[in-house]
């Protein structure tokens, strides 16, 4: 079974969103779906708004749609989008 390295971009609803709390919620969703978060970063967007970027590894057969949907359903999230997906080698 192949594994995928996935990058997801999470846009908070506003600049008032606690990004640390949001990051923990997103990591819990990814872990619950069988993923392992490796890298986390913040990307400035505009006017103080920052996007949360998480890179994680997941089994290829699971897919990313359930993760994207669950993250998008969070109250403090405007959108969640997979921005990169690659097969892991080795």
Predicted regions and their residues:
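Long, contiguous binding/interaction regions
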Residues: 1-90
């Amino acid at each position: 079974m192949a594994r995928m390295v996935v990058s997801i971009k999470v846009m908070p609803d506003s600049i008032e969103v606690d990004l640390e709390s949001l990051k923990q919620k997103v990591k819990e969703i990814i872990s619950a779906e069988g993923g392992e978060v490796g890298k986390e970063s913040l990307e400035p967007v505009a006017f103080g708004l920052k996007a949360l970027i998480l890179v994680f590894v997941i089994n290829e057969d699971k897919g990313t749609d359930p993760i994207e949907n669950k993250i998008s359903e969070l109250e403090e999230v405007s959108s969640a989008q997979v921005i990169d997906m690659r097969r892991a080698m080795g």
